[in-house]
Amino acid sequence: MDSTVYIGRRARLARCLRDAGGGVAVIATAPERNRNSDNDHPYRHDSSFHYLTGFDEPQAWLLIDADGAASLLCRPRDPAREIWDGLRLGVDAAPATLGVERAFDVAELDAVAPELLADRPAVWYPFGADAGVRERIHAWLATLRGRARSGVQAPAAQRDLAPLLAEMRLHKDAGELATMRRAAQISAGAHARAMRFCGERFRTDPGGAVREYEIEAELLHEFRRHGAQSPAYPAIVAAGANARVLHYAAADAPLRAGELCLIDAGCELDGYASDITRTFPADGRFTPAQRELYEIVLAAQAAATASTRPGARQRDAHHAAVRVLAQGMLDSGLLDRNRDGDVDAVIASTAYRQFYMHGTSHWLGRDVHDVGEYLSLAEAPCDTVDATGRPAVSKPSRVLAPGMVVTLEPGLYVRPAAGVPERFWNIGIRIEDDAVVTETGCELISRGVPVAAAEIEALMR
């Protein structure tokens, strides 16, 4: 994206500040993180900072006045350090390159920032920001209060910037959606590669095993060779019973013929995440029990997809998926009709949570669990259930609109238990796709990898 995109975003934020009474917004990029000794983790910018600037160097701050003026503080050019760490944009090039009105050496931050905040009604910053950011801002306010006898006023209010940024980021423009489609395409290709890899291994060595980390390596290779900068989150590659663990991380167990493999993985491309989950048979053929549960989950995702459209509530997809899953639990014998009742009773009692205990949908964007309010805060409270399924009173979930992006990810996770048919024990299944809300419904942008059981089996042959 060229600088005009970021200039437009900063102008929108400035309008939001004016509408809320004025002030100055302060956003710092992410700090560098030490791994050990003199080695740092690979650097990743703060998502909102990059959303407003397109600038991905560390040690940078952005201040935006309600009148629209943007000031960037960044590292200066340093030929000696650039030998070791690479080229820097530098202060002199920043205004023309990034479209900001002013640029300063970040070493001057504590002198420049108070001047930009002086006599402004409010300072806006993300209240969940790094503690160092809050401390820095409080120090600037103290500096300004010390100049009160000179007629200088410190901002009287501190306001949370995070909700304004979240609302902006929730609605994607055409450029953002194009990047997310490409990220989903790369990730879908990686999932397909992993399926083909397992199919080939078990064709040549039916009695052998594939380690989870071998499959993960196939994913990472495909991400990087197509230009993705990194995984969007640590990949979950779960063999057999490990698929019952929602955030499984070990990635060192063997996958054997007859077991399922659950992969939850997506790449990050140019600052945007993808998030795909597929569950497939290690040797390329579902057992009858595996396929029975798989078809239930796939039907639940179809119901969630049909419920994802403009004017629908964000939570509608979850309710639709739960109804299909609950009916499937009764039909398959996971739940006992005599004990648990019909589908409405199963939902009312939350008995389904024995096998499906997480939500179906979350926002997707620059972060894999992206920012954005899930509730419609302007509406009156309504009766609902909390995260554990207990009755609660809450705001209704917000209404979906074109340009929003969500995941749709129902699943079933079966642990050995009395009354649960043994043929289903230790099966874990999740199917997840990325959905762009359109004018008429939603577009699944991650279907470059098969999802139907027969298509998965065909790919692995």
Regions found by a protein language model. Give the residues of each.
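Active-site neighborhoods and metal-handling regions in enzymes and metal-associated proteins
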Residues: 1-461
